[in-house]
Every structure is written in C-alpha cells, then in structure tokens.
Amino acid sequence: MDPLASLDFTKSGGLVTAIAVDDATGDVLMVAAMNEQTLRMTLEKGEAVYWSRSRGIWHKGEQSGHTQRVKSVWIDCDGDVVLLRVEQRGGGACHTGKRSCFFRKLEDGRWVDVGEQVFDPAKVYGR
C-alpha cells in the first residue's frame, strides 16, 4: 500500500501542512507546505523537500547548506498535516538566521525576540 494514500491532499488545493520538529529537542523549527510530489521526494532523499507557493519545489537548505535530515514522519488524525522529526543541519532552520522560525514570544502584550541567532543571513543569502 502506498503510504501517501492515507493523506488528504484535496482540502488545501493539493497541499498539506508540514511541521518540522527538532528530533533531539522537540522544538518546533518551522511550518511549511508539501504536495504529493515533495513528500515523495522527502521520503526518497531522506531530507525535507517542501512546496513554496513562490518558488515551487524547495529542497530545504539547498542554497544555505542548512538541510533537514528526516528521522521520522508522522501524520495527524485527519491526514492533512505531516510532522517531520528532523536533524537540523548547519545551525538554523529560519531564513532570518534564527535556529527556529518561532523566535518571537508574547510577553506583557508585546512580541519579544527570544531566538538564538545561529548564522548571518546576509553572508548566507547575499542579501
């Protein structure tokens, strides 16, 4: 049986939500989208491949070297969310240079940056 048959790609125009979690710490690193093709590519490569609405197929870390080695794949009860437990390579998952895309915490009614800066995006992306 095809494992992707348990997923519902029809709810969001052919996409499912993908959550990347650090396998060692349990920290949420990022949320992205996947279509059937990129999920198959992820399973074949053993590295996270997402679908970007602006870029199309997006092999995470292909430009920066900050790839995500997939340790295990989980789906939710409705089959429309994929959880990837990953080994984050090269430091950061976020294009801002932070370890995680979730680095702003609401404290006393305002957003506070509590994230760890692990690389300089200007040096990595030339921006």
Regions found by a protein language model. Give the residues of each.
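C-terminal binding/interaction regions
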Residues: 2-15, 21-29, 34-127
